[in-house]
């Protein structure tokens, strides 16, 4: 359970929102604080990219899918594992989808 601006938001045991429609930027900030991530414009770009990906494909991207899709849309400098790992050190697909308020990617342990 997360308290965001006085509103209780349900999460699973790993901290992913149970109801993605409860996501907003304040939720992302609260989750980022728990994950020890200071959000920058680069983080927001990935968070919104992941949310758009989910809207289009109805699935949270695993790391390979995320890297490939980002490289196609944002270029090789942002669509690579090193760049994403720098932003999300506990696992780009795992942390980016968590901050985006989406379900945990199926291939994340």
Curated annotation (Swiss-Prot):
Q: Does the keyword Mitochondrion apply?
A: no
Q: What is its EC number?
A: 2.8.1.-
According to its UniProt record, which residues of this chain constitute the active site? 108 (cysteine persulfide intermediate)
Any one cellular-component term (Gene Ontology): cytoplasm
Q: Which UniProt keywords apply?
A: Cytoplasm, Transferase
Set out the biological process GO terms recorded for this chain's protein. tRNA wobble position uridine thiolation
Instruction: Name the Gene Ontology molecular function terms of this record.
Output: sulfur carrier activity; transferase activity
Where does it live in the cell?
Answer: Cytoplasm
Keyword field contains Transferase = yes
Question: What does this chain do?
Answer: Could be part of a sulfur-relay system.
The entry assigns this protein to a family as follows: Belongs to the DsrC/TusE family.
Tell me the protein's name. Answer: Sulfurtransferase TusE homolog
Q: Which organism is it from?
A: Haemophilus influenzae (strain ATCC 51907 / DSM 11121 / KW20 / Rd)
Q: What gene is it encoded by?
A: tusE
């Amino acid at each position: 359970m997360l308290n965001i601006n006085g509103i209780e938001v349900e999460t699973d045991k790993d901290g992913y929102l149970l109801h993605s429609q409860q996501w907003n930027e304040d939720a992302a900030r609260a989750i980022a604080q728990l994950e020890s991530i200071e959000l920058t414009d680069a983080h927001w770009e990935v968070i919104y990219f992941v949310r758009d990906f989910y809207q289009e494909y109805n699935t949270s991207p695993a790391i390979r899918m995320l890297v490939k899709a980002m490289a196609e849309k944002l270029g090789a400098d942002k669509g690579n594992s090193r760049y994403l790992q720098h932003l999300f050190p506990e696992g780009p697909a795992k942390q980016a989808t968590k901050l985006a308020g989406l379900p945990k990617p199926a291939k994340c342990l």
